[in-house]
């Protein structure tokens, strides 16, 4: 009943401590890849409550991609015990125009019963809640499981020096995570509404058509890459991606950008590029999708270049004892039965 007790401690008895610690985290201007002391703050608190910290920095200051990551564990003395881990990120997206915020985004202002600030829900508040819940329960009893925290500073960025490399390290050191809760905000309308148990895959790519410069008055001397790319995009839009997978939304393909870099209306450009993304269920994979994509290149006179920008596989967590316990715990605290969902964009849960 560990998860249930953690949630109860969090919501019913520990609110003020959670809020105070979350405020301390929000004050840190940790816009990716900057840390601004956020990990140091976590380490200090975790050490006090009996966790052992492992610093896992990846990248370099020289390349402006140094990411501070942390794996912290409170190891149970019981042999062959299981580990329950909470995965979170300390980095946040840029705050934009501060003048358009009601309160300073890095102040952590409490007003109207709400905590305001960049990262309050995504996800400094969640990290604070987990740590304070662990603190509360560890003061009261010895556990027969280990509690862990995996934190990255590279979730909102390109995600190359964050969770994916931490997981590689854990595998090398044979540190096993049996169950993991990722603290992303998953509730569209109210607390306890939804648990994300999987995500569709995501394939992002560019298609560039190479033609030949020319004046629009002499089209026979040119080769229009725009016409070729429009033909390809039309074919892609008409692809039948209708294979259904239980518990997953339908697969969809979206053209998100078409650009020539040509500001002139009377000149045929040399090249044209489109950016495209496919969100796909477990009935598809990258190899199958690429085969369909390349088939659309036929019948165009221009040279076609395909470049994969990013590729993430779909994943799904089947129902088990831990998931069932989590559902019951959420209902006990919120009186709401959570929906198990795979909607939305990819998260770094896929690495775990």
Regions found by a protein language model. Give the residues of each.
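Acyl-CoA/ACP chain-elongation machinery
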Residues: 108, 154, 214
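N-terminal helical capping/dimerization or prosegment-like subdomains
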Residues: 2-96, 271-275, 289-292
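Acidic/histidine-rich catalytic neighborhood of metal-dependent amide-processing enzymes
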Residues: 123-198
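Short glycine/serine- and small hydrophobic-enriched flexible loop segments
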Residues: 24, 131-139, 231-238
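Short secondary-structure junctions
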Residues: 50-59, 107-110, 303-307, 333-340
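Metal-dependent amide/peptide-bond hydrolase catalytic core
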Residues: 13, 186-190, 197, 203-351
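Active-site metal-coordination/substrate-binding segment of hydrolases
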Residues: 81-148, 172-173
